[in-house]
Amino acid sequence: EMSEFYRRNDPTRLVHYEGVCNDRRYNDTSDMESRMYPSAAYVRDFLQKDRSKPYLLCEYTHAMGNSCGGMHKYTDLTDEEPLFQGGFIWDYIDQSIYHKDRYGKEVLGYGGDFDDRPCDYNFSGNGIAYGGERMPSPKMQEVKFNYQNISITIEKDSFTVNNKNLFTNTADYDCQITLTLDGKRIAASTIELAVEPLSQQTYQLPRWKYQTPWSTEEPWKVTAAGEYVVTVSFVLKEDTLWAKRGHEVAFGQGIY
């Protein structure tokens, strides 16, 4: 009755109710199928059998501690399965606040740091941003990479750009290509690539004066031994309300 009340009074909004997965008598309550923390394989199998509704993870990829490592399995599934609508990460910001430890050093504290017993200890530290100034954690870098709408695959002497955006051409960004040797930048180029939305294109890597691992003459005879990394990035051309010019929106890497 409550779901029908919502639909009558605001037909512009979808109705979500996770509980239908536990009692199918109320299946019409929710406009979408929803679960917390099923595996990507479970979602794929479910949608192969039941395609009556889109599937949404109302909570997934719990971002506690050293986590988010398997997130790509879900974002890969969004590319493969049109009925899978993604999910909501738990959660965005660590529930932690600054306080001084026993040595007088200011640190981010959580359960148990304030003589609070019993408590859940670090269970509140489950965000992709730290508490305090909301600085990004390493988990945020993983999330950003998995959510980027432009993917770059680097081969021996070329790279393929897959533009997953629905409306944005990659020409709206600058494409930066850098070569590093053992972490030190030794060559760089900025170019403009126009890959239409929902399409892909392959390009050759630059022919820098510095002999590279993909030089055509002797492909693997390089000037110096070490780890060569080529990075192809797409960055903002101009300042926006949410980020400055040069902010990276997508990247891909190849290691030689």
Language-model segments: what does each one mean?
Residues 1-160, 165-185:
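Extended substrate-binding grooves/exosites of carbohydrate-active enzymes
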